[in-house]
Each structure stands twice: as C-alpha cells, then as structure tokens.
C-alpha cells in the first residue's frame, strides 16, 4: 500500500534529498541583482553556461578568439531554446539575449564574468590580468575550473576578494549543481552574491573550500581510477560499468569518463594523483595522446554512434567484490573530503555528490548509504579491500569519529 511505501528506507532517503535540495536553494541570503553575464571561452562548458544563463532570462555576451569557435555553441544554444521554450517567439528572444562579443567589448558592463577556457593555469592567469582592469566594481569574477586551486589561479589579481570558482557540470542543462568555491581571499559579499546568482539561474549552489578537485571531482576521480585498475586486471569495460549500474549509479565509471572527456579526466587525475596516492593510468594517457577523448571525438574507451556507446551485449556479470571496490573507494574519499574541511557538514557532502554526480539517489548520498549499511561494516569491508588491493582502501579515520556521533 501507499502507506507502507512512505515508510520504506528508499522513500525516507528521497524525502531527505528533497529537503537537502531546498536547503541548497535557501542558501541565498538575498535575491541576485545580476542582469548581465560575460562568458570567456565558447567550448562545450563555456558555450553551454552562456546558453543556460540566456535561457534563464539574463543578457549574455560570449567571447572566444574566432567566430568559428563560437558557432557550435550558438547551434547548441538554439537547440536548447527550441526544446525548452515553447511560447511563440520565446526561443528567438532567448537567442537575442545571447550575443557574440569576440573582442570582449562589453565585459565592463557585466555583473558576473565566468572564465571557461582550457585547464591551463598560465593561460587563465594571463586572461585575468588582461581584463581585470576593465571590470565593474563589485563584479563577481568566476572560474569554471574543474580542479585547479584558486590560489594558483588568483596570483596577481588586484582584487582577489572578488574571485571564486563557479564550477558547472556537463551537461549543463541537465546537472543541477554548481560548486561555489571560496578561495583564501574571497570575501563574504562575493560568496553570497555568487550563491544568489546560482540560485537565480535555477541551479543548486554547493559552497566549498578550494582544495584539489573540490568535492565532486575529488570523489569521482578514485571511482573512475578504480574502474581503470580493474580493467587492467582483466575485467571487461562492460562488466565494470554494470557493477556500478547494479548499485544504482546512472552511468558506469568507464562510460562516465568517456562522457566527461578523457582529456578532462586526465587533467583532473594528474592534479589529484598525489592526493589520492594513485598513479595516473598509462591507459588513460595513451587514449588522450591518440586523440581518443571519448564521446566528443566518437571514440574513447568505447566507440560512440549517435552519442551512444557501443557496448558488448555478452560479458561476465559483475560480482559483489567489484561493486564494493568502485563504491567504497568513492565513499572513503568523500569522508576524506569532509574531514579536510572542503564542505561544512555531511549533509552538504551528500547533497553535492548526489546532485553533482547522480550518485544513486535512493541511497540518500554516500554518507547516508554508509550509515544505513553500517559504519562498522564499511570500515571492516575497507580493511578487507586494503589487504587485497592496497592502501588506497585504508579506512579514513573519519569513519571512527562518525561512529562516536551516532
């Protein structure tokens, strides 16, 4: 009966996620006054961020080096507007709000500036130094970096107090989370205005501290790395993905890496490898060097046709051990992330991982899943995995601390 369903663990977890979503939306202390956004970089992320802001009613200028680089972004924007806006003239009006500005002539009118160029620190710093003198007072200067520390990127800024991370996720139109990353110099006013801006454009803000990989990429990296290690041991790619999907993940780690882009995955992995204590897999480097970057090039670990990976239909079914390897290494890193102070509390951590990665929503998030499975069970399972596969599975001390609070 419906009454029985209401009291199931799954139902309670989904209700919990509803309230976590409302908590994120409620983080804005006041409505955003932002009306104009300038995005630098018209690649997949920059172009789609610009289109999303225009869809939400803001005036947006999009800058890149040439019109040829901007045209694909405009095509994707038109598709987005036509699919989302059905009222007569609404899609055309949104297209008019999205303007090309190759020279950055209108950057001085923007309330929010978002940098979304390639993950090269020197190039990002040079760009900031070039346009910072032209920015309005009290502007929000955001970088969409996926994992580079803000201290490194903010060197040389005249007003580092206005600088922070605004990390959107791909695909922008589908994933609701934006990590709002505070650097050492970011002031409260900028942080609060950035949170309000994220809410204004219909996204969920996750405040976090600048740390390698921030929240989402930090917990995803060991999950994807474990998948590649399992593949090197002889597990089929399809078996690995099926193990994660059987747990409840929307996409397996191998397909996820292909969809994120293997070049992006490599950038993140190189930044995080020291933190995680896991070397960058040679297989990942080889794929990138060969130009096989995943879905965007039509080939990565899988071959893609019509944006769908071609997977073998017959493969070995995954065993519970493989599922635990993938999920528990993610859980362990999530705990490390919290203990390092990257997020304020465990509820925010759960919200960030679910809304940023699609982590099995019915579990309520990684920490909620650990509580319901049993923290002591998680610790013992991690110890067993550490004996079999190495110290990357050694239980983080935070698990024992969590037991004392239950």
What is the meaning of each model-derived region?
Residues 1-406:
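N-terminal glycine-rich phosphate-binding loop for ADP-containing cofactors
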């Amino acid at each position: 009966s419906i009454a029985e369903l209401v009291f199931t663990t799954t139902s309670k977890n989904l209700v919990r996620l509803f309230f976590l979503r409302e908590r994120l939306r409620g983080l804005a202390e006041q409505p955003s006054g932002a009306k104009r956004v300038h995005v630098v970089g018209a690649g997949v992320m920059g172009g789609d961020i610009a289109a999303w802001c225009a869809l939400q009613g803001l005036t947006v200028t999009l800058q890149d080096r040439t019109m040829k680089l901007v045209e694909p972004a405009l095509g994707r924007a038109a598709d987005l507007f036509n699919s989302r806006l059905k009222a007569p003239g609404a899609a055309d009006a949104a297209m008019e709000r999205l303007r090309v500005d190759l020279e950055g002539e209108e950057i001085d009118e923007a309330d929010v500036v978002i940098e979304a160029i390639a993950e090269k620190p020197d190039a990002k710093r040079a760009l900031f130094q070039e346009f910072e003198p032209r920015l309005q007072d009290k502007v929000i200067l955001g970088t969409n970096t996926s994992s580079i520390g803000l201290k490194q990127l903010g060197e040389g800024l005249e007003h580092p107090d206005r600088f922070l991370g605004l990390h959107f996720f791909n695909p922008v139109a589908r994933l609701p989370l934006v990590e709002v990353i505070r650097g050492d110099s970011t002031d409260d006013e900028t942080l609060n205005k950035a949170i309000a801006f994220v809410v204004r454009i219909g996204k969920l803000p996750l405040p976090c501290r600048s740390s390698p990989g921030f929240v989402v990429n930090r917990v995803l990296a060991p999950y994807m790395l474990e998948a590649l290690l399992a593949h090197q041991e002889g597990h089929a790619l399809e078996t690995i993905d099926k193990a994660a999907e059987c747990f409840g993940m929307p996409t397996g780690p191998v397909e996820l890496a292909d969809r994120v882009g293997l070049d992006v995955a490599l950038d993140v992995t190189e930044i995080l490898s020291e933190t995680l204590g896991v070397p960058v897999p040679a297989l990942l480097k080889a794929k990138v060097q060969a130009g096989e970057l995943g879905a965007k090039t039509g080939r990565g670990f899988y071959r893609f046709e019509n944006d769908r990976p071609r997977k073998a239909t017959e493969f070995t079914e995954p065993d519970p051990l493989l599922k635990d390897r993938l999920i528990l290494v993610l859980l362990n890193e999530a705990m490390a992330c919290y203990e390092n102070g990257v997020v304020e509390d465990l509820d925010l951590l759960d919200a960030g991982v679910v809304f940023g990665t699609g982590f099995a929503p019915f579990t309520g998030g990684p920490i909620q899943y650990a509580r319901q499975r049993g923290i002591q069970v998680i610790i013992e399972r991690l110890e067993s995995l550490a004996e079999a596969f190495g110290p990357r599975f050694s239980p983080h001390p935070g698990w024992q601390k969590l037991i004392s609070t239950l």
